[in-house]
Amino acid sequence: NPHDTFLKWLKNPPASAKQVIDKWRKTPHYEGYESKIDARITALPKYRHIDQKFFDRHGVDPLAATLVVSPSTEQLHQGFEMIPRGEILEQPALLVNLPSILDPSMTNKSDHVFSLEALFTPFSFKNGWTSNAEPKRWLDKYAEIVEPGFIDSIADWRCVTPANYETDFFLPKGHATSFAGGPLAALLNSQPELTRYRTPIEGLFLTGAATFPGAGVWGASGKNAAITILAK
């Protein structure tokens, strides 16, 4: 988190760091907007509007892939604009996985692991995150696209919200700053502390999701930062 690194953790920073500190002071830090439900289910869901015969002919298991349940583009934009108001779409965007389909070692032969990620679920949700009422609503929304019985198949479940990401993983406002640029941004090097991992402060290097190549490419940022340090 470059914000905390430069604005909170540095004590008596050298004059050489003034420019980068001023830059990050002017850079907004957004709040988290992702929540994740993990559940143990006793029966696999069956989608209502999927032609199973089509997948069987091609040897594909539709439950092995990530299912994206997305509202319209206009609604997605609306969901983004609702974040500052602490509101959530009636039909939030959902990402659904059953990891135990791909990894049978995660199941006891009768139960499966079910994962549902909901987007545009703000840290500052106006109803608060102390209740499971809102996450339960996402499960109900998912249940609308599968055959009856899904809710009854849920044996145990938990939800990790942006509030949990802050308290359990120390992410300010439940948000992990992620590098928003791509390879071109790295080549242009307009933010060397993020793309080259070096800072104006001797001995201080950055790594993590905020640095190139960003979240989702596990370990790449740390490896690049380590190479940079060892090359000194």
Regions picked out by a protein language model, each given a short descriptive name:
Residues 44-45, 60, 73-91, 128-169:
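Flavin-binding catalytic cores
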